[in-house]
Amino acid sequence: MTSPSLLRGFGAYAPERILTNADIESMVETTDEWITTRTGIRQRHVVAPGQTTSDLAVEAARAALADAALDTADITHVLVATCTPDASCPNTACIVARKLGMTGVMALDCNAACSGFLYGLELAQGIVAARPASRVLLVAAEALSLRCNWKDRTTCVLFGDGAGATVVTADVDATQGTAVLEDSIVTSDGSLGDLLTIGGGTANPYAIGDSVGEEYFVRMQGRDVFKHAVRSMTQVCNDLLARNGFTTEDVDLVIPHQANLRIIEAVGDRLGFASEKVFVNVHDFGNTSAASIPLALADARAQGRIRPGMRVLLTTFGGGFTWGAALLRF
């Protein structure tokens, strides 16, 4: 990357309603011990009745704008990463822009499942590189609780709802809440897509009067996804570090996609990072898909885990399959 983009300001939002493992015990045949042992998740935030993905996105966007000391009038593009849009049309970015009172902006959705934030970051960087005066409001938001099969204990225990946001810009004089995007890699392998799906598109359309089948909800081959996720995130991180001449010693903190604790620990171990260098908040939020990394970034900053001068390695893996990694310098 010859002219690095800046991430200016970070914001996050999680719905007020919390669903604990004890709550889920009354819904499906499972226990708190079973969930915690296998996933590390103790609770997850879920939307209230009538609350949508765009509602979560708006709250995170407002927080990011405030952190960046920017106003909606400063934004030229709105990019929303989600696999749980409010509707097929209009796109969620247009809805977010409307709710924020914004007109005259380019508004676009990006769907790369759990990799959505890093894919969105790649797109935003391209926009800023082509049009240096641009300021891209990048929001990743999911309401996966609305697409979970609450009778399937293998998936419903994993997911939560939330949103995270940042502003991508080339403002070299910006200092407040700023990180430099040093480099990133995103990639995919569509041949493995059937291992993790959310149905309901034109390949499986519904007619009026049809009952909703299991294929409408999240379906996942957990063991296969685990294997590919760990291998892919490890490899892409090694590739990114190598092409920048870095080793693990040059990284101060790793923020992996918060899929589950076993995946997070396996990736950290294979990369050779001490556990204290790997940020984890999956126990409080569950897997929030595209929102996972920006939510974790905001959380890590709030906890004082990220300080000026630190280099942070992000890595993710999602349906598609899609995966990637990015290096930020704060």
Swiss-Prot record:
What residues form the catalytic site here?
C114, H257, N287
Specify the pathway.
Answer: Lipid metabolism; fatty acid biosynthesis
Domain of life, per lineage: Bacteria
Where is the segment annotated ACP-binding? Answer: 258-262
Where is this protein localized, as stated in its record?
Cytoplasm
| Alphabetized UniProt keyword annotations | Acyltransferase, Cytoplasm, Fatty acid biosynthesis, Fatty acid metabolism, Lipid biosynthesis, Lipid metabolism, Multifunctional enzyme, Transferase
Q: Which reaction does it catalyse?
A: malonyl-[ACP] + acetyl-CoA + H(+) = 3-oxobutanoyl-[ACP] + CO2 + CoA
The EC designation for this entry is 2.3.1.180
What range does the record give for the signal peptide? Answer: none
GO annotations of cellular component type: cytoplasm
Which GO terms are recorded in the biological process aspect for this UniProt protein? fatty acid biosynthetic process; secondary metabolite biosynthetic process
Give the chief site where it resides. Answer: cytoplasm
Q: Name one GO molecular function term.
A: beta-ketoacyl-acyl-carrier-protein synthase III activity
Q: Which EC class is this protein assigned?
A: transferase
Function text: Catalyzes the condensation reaction of fatty acid synthesis by the addition to an acyl acceptor of two carbons from malonyl-ACP. Catalyzes the first condensation reaction which initiates fatty acid synthesis and may therefore play a role in governing the total rate of fatty acid production. Possesses both acetoacetyl-ACP synthase and acetyl transacylase activities. Its substrate specificity determines the biosynthesis of branched-chain and/or straight-chain of fatty acids.
Assembly description: Homodimer.
Q: Which HAMAP family match?
A: FabH
What note about domains is in the entry? The last Arg residue of the ACP-binding site is essential for the weak association between ACP/AcpP and FabH.
State the family named in the UniProt similarity comment for this chain: Belongs to the thiolase-like superfamily. FabH family.
What is this protein called in UniProt? Beta-ketoacyl-[acyl-carrier-protein] synthase III
Organism annotation: Nitratidesulfovibrio vulgaris (strain ATCC 29579 / DSM 644 / CCUG 34227 / NCIMB 8303 / VKM B-1760 / Hildenborough)
Gene field: fabH
